């Protein structure tokens, strides 16, 4: 390493002299983003986009200006959750994100497609490049908190986001299943490698409440989230039930009407950073 000149831009080494700042992409000069929160999961099907939407709505209700960057290029669903169908437009300065009914700024590949049902059949590097452009080319206007809805797993796009965008904290979404320990572990270890703090765990689909008697039914079996949280020294920020009303609101683009009290602790953890 004696020949290192401090220029990491043309070096593939992961030595201790590598400056993380050198990998960050510059935000669009016309944009302003104060904090970036990534919402991740080790696997698909845990309701990560629903949790992202709930957190965004809860933060907006705190009086903060909120944006949501949909980084799940091949499986985007954020526009549907908020009933957003198009961007505001573009000019020589960049691309203006779509606006939800309450003024949240939304950016997703679906807002750029002629038909939202069209598949995005791209290879990893192209997908990663698109996510970078959502940071460098989009004019996020005075955003206090930008939530990044990540694709599941620990592949190209999560790596690109963590290296290219200055993420301030990570929320891990999981569900009460046997693989939870391994899945959360992968997400935590990746966060540690990227030197990004994990704010806590949100367990989704934690239980179903019987509409007749009110009893909690553990549909996916007994939760292991407390054991996993203790293993990684992380707080459990929320236990969200299976709620048909939330699912219906998501499908109808009405997430801004949903009660968000269940994620209050997660919102507090984000506000504390």
Q: What are the functions of these language-model segments?
A:
Residues 66, 71-116, 128:
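Phosphate-binding loop that captures ATP/GTP phosphates
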Residues 107, 150, 163, 269-270:
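Glycine-rich phosphate-binding loops of nucleotide-dependent enzymes
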Residues 1-21, 188-273:
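C-terminal lobe/tail of nucleotide-utilizing enzymes
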Residues 33, 44, 70, 78, ...:
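Residue-level signature of catalytic and energy-coupling elements of molecular machines
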Residues 141-148, 154-155, 166-187:
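Conserved Switch II/interswitch segment of TRAFAC-class P-loop GTPases
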Residues 1-42, 87:
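Extreme N-terminal, non-catalytic leader segments
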Residues 113-161:
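Phosphate-binding/switch loop-helix module in NTP-utilizing enzymes
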Residues 35-73, 188:
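Walker A/P-loop phosphate-binding motif and the immediately C-terminal alpha-helix
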């Amino acid at each position: 390493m004696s020949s290192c000149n401090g220029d990491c831009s043309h070096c593939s080494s992961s030595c201790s002299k590598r400056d993380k700042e050198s990998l960050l992409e510059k935000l669009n000069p016309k944009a302003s983003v104060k904090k970036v929160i990534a919402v991740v999961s080790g696997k698909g099907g845990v309701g990560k986009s629903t949790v992202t939407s709930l957190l965004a709505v809860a933060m907006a209700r705190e009086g903060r200006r909120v944006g949501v960057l949909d980084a799940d290029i091949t499986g985007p669903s954020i526009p549907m959750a908020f009933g957003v169908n198009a961007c505001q437009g573009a000019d020589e300065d960049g691309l203006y994100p779509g606006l939800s009914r309450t003024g949240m700024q939304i950016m997703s590949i679906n807002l750029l497609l002629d038909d939202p049902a069209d598949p995005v059949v791209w290879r990893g590097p192209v997908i990663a490049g698109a996510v970078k452009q959502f940071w460098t080319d989009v004019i996020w206007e005075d955003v206090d908190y930008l939530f990044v809805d990540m694709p599941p797993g620990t592949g190209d796009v999560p790596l690109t986001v963590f290296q290219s965008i200055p993420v301030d904290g990570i929320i891990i979404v999981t569900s009460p299943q046997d693989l939870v320990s391994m899945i959360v572990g992968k997400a935590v270890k990746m966060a540690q490698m990227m030197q990004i703090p994990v704010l806590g765990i949100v367990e989704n689909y934690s239980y179903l409440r019987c509409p007749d008697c009110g009893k909690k039914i553990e549909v996916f079996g007994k939760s292991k989230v407390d054991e996993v949280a203790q293993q990684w020294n992380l707080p459990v920020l929320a236990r969200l039930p299976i709620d048909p009303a939330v699912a219906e609101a998501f499908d109808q683009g009405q997430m801004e009407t949903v009660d968000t009290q269940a994620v209050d602790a997660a919102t507090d953890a984000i506000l504390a950073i």
